Amino acid sequence: SYHGIPKKYFDKGDPYHCYCHKTTRLISEKFNSIEIKTTFQSRFGPQKWLEPYTDKTLESLPSEGKKNVLTICPGFSSDCVETLEEILIEGKDSFLNFGGENFDMVPCLNDNEDHISLLKSLIQKNI
């Protein structure tokens, strides 16, 4: 699940949507036997946002025979309300209420030493 943006930005040429799909494709190449979907979360207001929506996808998966879900939010560096509440709490509840059986979430990188080392390297390259 990636943080969504209003569709009008995509329509105007914002590359974010493409970055998300490329990230998912690259992850999928590492796990050929696992079905991986790109979805977008955190929409609000009346305008159209990038689809498919994470909440609607989680609701529909059990009826498609998918009873086990492992979620990851690669667009988030650190866990926050969008990952912990929106996905791990609300998303899990919704998935289970619609007939799912097992739901888990890979935590964001947070303060993992490899993450901090990567950030240090990126900062050093750019200063």
What is each residue range found by the language model?
Residues 1-127:
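Extended amphipathic ligand-handling, pore-lining, and cofactor/metal-binding catalytic surfaces
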